[in-house]
Amino acid sequence: METARQPAPLQGLRLGYRAGILELLRLVQGAGEARVAALPGGVVSNLIDGLLVLDGAFKPDSQAADVGGGSVVAFTERAPDKDTENEDTVAVIPWGPESVVLVVADGAGGLPAGKRASMTAVSSLVEALSIAMSETVVLRTAILDGIEAANEAVKRLANGSATTLTVVTIEGRIARAYQIGDSEAVVVGQRGRIRLQTTAHSPTGFAVEAGFLDEREALHHAERHLVSNFLGTSDMSIDIGAPIDLRPMDTVLLASDGLMDNVHLDEIIEHIRKGPADAAVEAVVELARKRMHSNNGKEPSKPDDLSLIVFRKRPAARRRSPGKPSRGGAAK
């Protein structure tokens, strides 16, 4: 395997790859602003206020914020009993006061390639969006250009690595999903109705979509682990979803296969469809952990890195008609 170049000096220090990533994350999560460091190739000085990037390399990482006109909780941790680092990377990228970009990347290829691929993809996407923001580029165009740039950046690593990448953009009340690989996105209503569900780019994912398997059968299928589309390859393809209008109290979920391969979709929906977002994340994380450790043959059990984002848009403020008495007082 070819050795990748070391990152450029960050803030005057010459850092190894792992130290450079940790310094990036320290900057990302400090003082309400983020300094986005490109991986091999240089340092980007663009600032995105409120940016969250979760690494969770060796211990669980959880972040919550009010962003994009709603509330978000993001979580990532490595697989149980795993000696190597978590290969997932998660990001929440603000795009103005009422818009946000949610990102889950699940690196493939093993240490250090998997983590490097997912972090490179996320860093490249953040860099592209920060530039597009300053140039007032349309978000859909910025996302597609950013994904293409991320694909080229991972290919340039030349170490055989690749990563999934699932993105959901929320602009006002409009949500749209972009998918490469088997990390998934779901939008559900407060009563549990599925309003959007992406298709995993895998043999079992396509079989479920075509009706040859149901979702419970797919969780136990021998080829569940196979993935047919990755970022970092010459034949990478982007699955672009149709825009949907978010309704009050709709919940948006992005998750790596660490969640989707261990918890049935109806169980996930029951936990996330209502109630505080942080409680929803805690509940599905605990259930996924339990399944990963059980392996009783009855329930799905696939130890893996676990990452998810739960976002819920704030309900629109109700407008009071002119002359209508306010609660507790008469109209003037």
Task: Give the location of each predicted region.
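PP2C/PPM-type serine/threonine phosphatase catalytic domain
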Residues: M1-K332
